[in-house]
A protein has these predicted regions:
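Short amphipathic alpha-helical/adjacent loop interface patches that line ligand
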Residues: 34, 41, 121, 151, ...
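Glycine/threonine-rich helix-loop capping motifs at alpha-helix boundaries
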Residues: 120-129, 170-172
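Short Gly/Ser/Thr- and charged-rich N-terminal loops/segments
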Residues: 67-69
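Active-site PLP attachment segment
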Residues: 80-116, 128-131
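Amphipathic alpha-helix from the class-I
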Residues: 111-116, 130-152, 162-169
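Conserved glycine-rich beta-strand-loop-beta hairpin in the small C-terminal domain of fold type I
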Residues: 137, 154-162, 173-180
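Active-site phosphate-binding strand-loop segment of PLP-dependent enzymes
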Residues: 1-64
């Protein structure tokens, strides 16, 4: 939460990493909490690296944002006023489009950040093969209804696990609100 983040800031702090929905807990950071975190980051001139790989897989109905106007998605700190220019959003096609193993991901960030990360990426690996790139474009540009179907399947599986563990007296269950 914002208070914990602010308490942990030192003169060496340059960025905060947010993972929402979080894996493996399924915790989703609310839009209100993201706004509080954004204020802390703006006050201390700190960047945010936001891992949003699981953003379309939320199970609560309280998140308000949508994917293509349809299903609820986890809120993004990049949408908070004043945060677009200090946020690096990390995304992947692996989860949303069931393309695990294809190793296709992307960043949403200010142009200067993209230029610098491109230099680093060139030195770390070659490029994603062309077939995977075309498949990624097709996944992003194509129909998104399968994402909702996958989310419903995950929701049903989550419920099976919750029901199975509900009677265990030694466990205190926290119902996951999102993730894979």
């Amino acid at each position: 939460n914002a208070a914990d983040i602010e308490a942990a800031i030192t003169p060496r702090t340059r960025a905060v990493i947010i993972n929402s929905p979080g894996n493996p807990t399924g915790a989703v950071t609310s839009a209100a909490e993201l706004a509080r975190i954004a204020e802390v980051c703006k006050q201390h001139n700190i960047w945010v690296i936001s891992d949003e790989v699981y953003h379309p897989f939320v199970f609560g109905e309280t998140f308000g944002e949508t994917l293509g106007g349809e299903a609820a998605v986890a809120p993004s700190i990049a949408a908070v006023p004043g945060m677009k220019d200090r946020t690096i959003v990390v995304e992947s096609l692996s989860k949303t489009y069931a393309m695990t193993g294809w190793r296709i991901g992307y960043l949403l960030a200010p142009e200067a950040v993209i230029e610098q990360t491109g230099k680093i990426a060139e030195l770390m690996h070659s490029s994603v093969n062309s077939l995977a790139q075309y498949a990624g474009v097709a996944a992003l540009a194509g129909p998104q209804d399968h994402v909702a179907a996958m989310r419903e399947e995950y929701r049903a599986k989550r419920q099976i696990v919750l029901d199975g563990l509900a009677g265990c007296p030694v466990l205190r269950l926290i119902e996951p609100q999102g993730a894979f």
